[in-house]
């Protein structure tokens, strides 16, 4: 009897495994089309674009065919712009504070083909987006909002989950000098402020953005009026600090800044290069003319920042 039970158990196991194997011969999910563009905590997908001398760069955005089996046919996916989704995000996150909204990138700064081909036997294709970053003012938060459009002939189905069919690309150009600098060694103070003049103003981090291949800007929240542009003069250690609004904010340099760059291989992971960029001898003044209507508040900053 024990032998009979063993035989029956073996037959049941074989049938179960056979059934499982048969299941995987057929598609378990729809072959939906989606972007590979995971969002961050701000609701957008940050893409870092290396700044070239020409200002032009290419970003390859993956387009996926979901499912448990291989795609067995050629698919032509149509891509379009979706300003409505960007507006919905802005209203949900910032309400009526339009000064905080993400801005749709002007069409002169990008181009991409209307369709992407995904070949039979492949589950991924790429949308090649050509960006021209020349003259792009990073005072605004630029986003390229994309969507997978419905197939005119019904040959594919877009993934209707919001963050799969849509891609809100937050464009972040970078160069060798842009990034987050430590600001603890850059001290500011109020000028002509009486008892409060000697109180130090310190910011632990200073985020800089690329303007071109060798220029960055460091800004406060109201950065349209108070941008500071740092140009690293080629083949020297000179850093030229300027403002494009000095006639209003009274920006003035007291000492010419200089740069120091140190590179060394990591002691533990020798395949990593550690690069430190320092901007030294920073000494400038400016006047805040928007914080308090009718008043001008003068600041002076001195020290070093490093990344």
Where are these regions (language model features)?
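C-terminal motif of bacterial Sec signal peptides marking the signal peptidase cleavage site
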Residues: 15-19
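Intrinsically disordered, low-complexity regulatory regions in eukaryotic proteins
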Residues: 21-117, 126-143, 149-307
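Bacterial N-terminal signal peptides that target proteins for export
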Residues: 1-8
């Amino acid at each position: 009897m024990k032998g009979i039970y063993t035989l029956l158990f073996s037959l049941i196991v074989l049938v179960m495994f056979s059934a499982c194997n048969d299941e995987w011969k057929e598609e378990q999910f729809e072959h939906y089309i989606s972007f590979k563009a995971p969002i961050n905590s701000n609701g957008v997908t940050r893409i870092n674009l290396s700044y070239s001398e020409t200002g032009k760069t290419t970003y390859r955005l993956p387009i996926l065919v979901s499912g448990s089996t291989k795609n067995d046919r050629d698919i032509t996916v149509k891509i379009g712009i979706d300003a409505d989704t960007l507006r919905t995000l802005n209203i949900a996150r910032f309400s009526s504070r339009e000064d905080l909204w993400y801005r749709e990138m002007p069409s002169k700064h990008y181009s991409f083909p209307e369709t992407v081909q995904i070949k039979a036997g492949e589950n991924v294709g790429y949308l090649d987006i050509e960006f021209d970053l020349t003259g792009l003012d990073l005072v605004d938060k630029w986003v390229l909002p994309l969507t997978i459009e419905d197939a005119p002939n019904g040959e594919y189905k877009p993934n209707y989950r919001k963050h799969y069919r849509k891609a809100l690309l937050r464009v972040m150009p970078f160069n060798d000098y842009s990034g987050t600098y430590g600001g603890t060694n850059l001290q500011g103070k109020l000028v002509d402020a009486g008892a409060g003049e000697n109180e130090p103003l310190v910011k632990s981090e200073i985020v800089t953005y690329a303007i071109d291949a060798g220029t960055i800007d460091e800004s406060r929240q109201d950065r349209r009026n108070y941008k500071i542009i740092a140009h690293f003069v080629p083949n020297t250690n000179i850093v030229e600090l300027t403002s494009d609004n000095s006639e209003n904010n009274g920006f003035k340099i007291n000492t010419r800044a200089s740069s120091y760059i140190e590179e060394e291989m990591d002691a533990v992971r020798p395949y990593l290069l550690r690069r430190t960029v320092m901007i030294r001898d920073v000494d400038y003044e400016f006047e805040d003319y928007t914080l308090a209507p009718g008043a001008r508040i003068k600041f002076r900053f001195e020290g070093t920042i490093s990344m």
